[in-house]
Swiss-Prot record:
Homotrimer. Keywords: Acyltransferase, Amino-acid biosynthesis, Cytoplasm, Diaminopimelate biosynthesis, Lysine biosynthesis, Repeat, Transferase. One of its GO terms (cellular component) is cytoplasm. Disulfide bonds: none annotated. It comes from Acinetobacter baylyi (strain ATCC 33305 / BD413 / ADP1). Its EC number is 2.3.1.117. Pathway: Amino-acid biosynthesis; L-lysine biosynthesis via DAP pathway; LL-2,6-diaminopimelate from (S)-tetrahydrodipicolinate (succinylase route): step 1/3. One of its GO terms (biological process) is lysine biosynthetic process via diaminopimelate. This is 2,3,4,5-tetrahydropyridine-2,6-dicarboxylate N-succinyltransferase. It is found in: Cytoplasm. GO terms for molecular function: 2,3,4,5-tetrahydropyridine-2,6-dicarboxylate N-succinyltransferase activity; nucleotidyltransferase activity. Substrate binds at residues 104, 141.
Length: 273
């Protein structure tokens, strides 16, 4: 793997020196190998090791290089036609392949090649971008979007219209991460590499980026870029220092309890084979 990452890193540094037409074969092969690994889940842009999230920047660079190395081409889907550089993930899949993957894909959900969905993932009419990783038993509900290289944990519910930010444009250093057992309420947006830690519940209509104040009303502490594990978060505001106006903030109102869990529990019937 070190050889693969070295080729990608060097190619990215020298990307101005070649085009899709004259790209060296070893670079093209390395980019394809990286995308295949992202697509089948053997590689991922970020992973938790010894309690810390480690970002493999070289894989993000491989994704960016793939746009340079591939030309746009017509992509057909029934009566619809598209023109893009990235194939859709499930194009040409057989019933056997879907059964083996254990993923349910409701039309017209779209996942790009280079994204991964683990067993018992349900894709309602939604969009999953290249480099994203969606772990087991997670539902991506209607009109939700999972951005490029975003990391979604196990047993997560992304409600209708949720937006999980990507890293490619505007270019971000780290992917947005939703850890295991989280619930993200309808129309909420989590972007700019924010980490929502395990078991957190985000209410409907909460918007969190790196500059968003995340205020814990119990302790008075303000967090940036991280929602602590087990938090229940709602939209709110905090007063300015002079008291003349208020600015948006995300408010931690409590820790998850049995009542919260009952309201946000997953329905196994929707994930049955």
């Amino acid at each position: 793997m070190s050889q693969l990452s070295t080729i990608i890193e060097q190619a990215f540094e020298n990307r101005a020196n070649f085009t899709a037409a004259d790209c060296p074969a070893d670079i093209r092969q390395a980019v394809e190998e990286a995308l295949s690994g992202l697509d089948n889940g053997t590689l991922r842009v970020a992973e938790k090791i010894d309690g810390e999230w480690i970002v493999h920047q070289w894989l993000k660079k491989a994704v960016l290089l793939s746009f340079k190395l591939n030309d746009n081409k017509p992509i057909e889907s029934g009566d619809l036609a598209f023109y893009d550089k990235v194939d859709t993930k499930f194009a040409g899949w057989t019933e056997e392949q879907f059964k083996e993957a254990g993923v349910r894909v409701v039309p017209p959900a779209v996942a790009r090649r280079g994204s991964y969905q683990a067993k018992n993932v349900v894709l309602m009419p939604s969009y999953v971008n290249i480099g994203a990783y969606v772990d087991e038993n997670t539902m991506v509900d209607t009109w939700a979007t999972v951005g490029s290289c975003a990391q979604i944990g196990k047993n997560v519910h992304l409600s209708g219209g949720v937006g999980i930010g990507g890293v490619l444009e505007p270019l971000q250093a780290n992917p947005t991460i939703i850890e295991d057992n989280c619930f993200i309420g309808a129309r909420s947006e989590i972007v700019e590499g924010v980490i929502v830690e395990e078991g957190a519940v985000i209410s409907m209509g909460v918007y969190i980026g790196q500059s968003t104040r995340i205020y814990d009303r119990e302790t008075g502490e303000i967090h940036y870029g991280r929602v602590p594990a087990g938090s229940v978060v709602v939209p709110g505001s905090l007063p300015s220092k002079d008291g003349k106006y208020s600015l948006y903030a995300a408010i931690i109102v409590k820790k998850v309890d049995a009542q919260t869990r009952a309201k946000t529990s997953l329905n196994d019937l929707l994930r049955a084979d």
